[in-house]
Amino acid sequence: MAYAYRRTIHLADTDAAGVVYFAQLLHICHEAYEICLIGNGMDWSGLLREGTVALPIVHSAIDFLRPITWGDRLDIQLYPELENSRQFKISYRIFKENQDSPPESPLATALTRHVAINPRTRQRCSLPPVVETWLRNAPKIEDSKI
C-alpha cells in the first residue's frame, strides 16, 4: 500500500483555463512528500539544522492524463525508491478521491528525483542513514510505468 496524502484543489491552484496549473501539481506532490516524511517520524528540521545534507530535486516530470479542476479532492499516492547510496526517486500517482470504491485510473502521474549533497561544498554525498532506512522500508510501486 502506498503512502497517501489527500488534498483539495483550491482556486489558486488553477490557471485561466480552470485546470490545475502544472507547476502547482508538482508543488502539491512535494507537499505530499513533506507530510510523508513527518508522518514516518523523520526529524527533517533536525537534519536541516545540522547542515550536513540537502536533498535537492534534480529531475521532475509530470503527465496529465485527465483534467484536474477546482474543488477536486485528490488522493496522492507516493512510492519512494532508493536508486543508489546518493540518490532516490519518488513516483506519484494522483487519483480523484472516491471513498466508496477502488480508485479509477490516475488523473496524473509524476516523478521527482533527489540527490544527497553536502550543502557547504555542493558535492554529492551519501544519503543519511535515516533516509536510506525510510527508502528501504517504503512501499513498492506495483507498476513501474512512471
From Swiss-Prot:
SUPFAM superfamilies: Thioesterase/thiol ester dehydrase-isomerase. It catalyses: 1,4-dihydroxy-2-naphthoyl-CoA + H2O = 1,4-dihydroxy-2-naphthoate + CoA + H(+). GO terms for biological process: phylloquinone biosynthetic process. Pfam families: 4HBT_2. The keyword Ion transport does not apply. It is an enzyme of class 3 (hydrolase). Its EC number is 3.1.2.28. Keywords: Hydrolase. Belongs to the 4-hydroxybenzoyl-CoA thioesterase family. DHNA-CoA hydrolase subfamily. Catalyzes the hydrolysis of 1,4-dihydroxy-2-naphthoyl-CoA (DHNA-CoA) to 1,4-dihydroxy-2-naphthoate (DHNA), a reaction involved in phylloquinone (vitamin K1) biosynthesis. This is 1,4-dihydroxy-2-naphthoyl-CoA hydrolase.
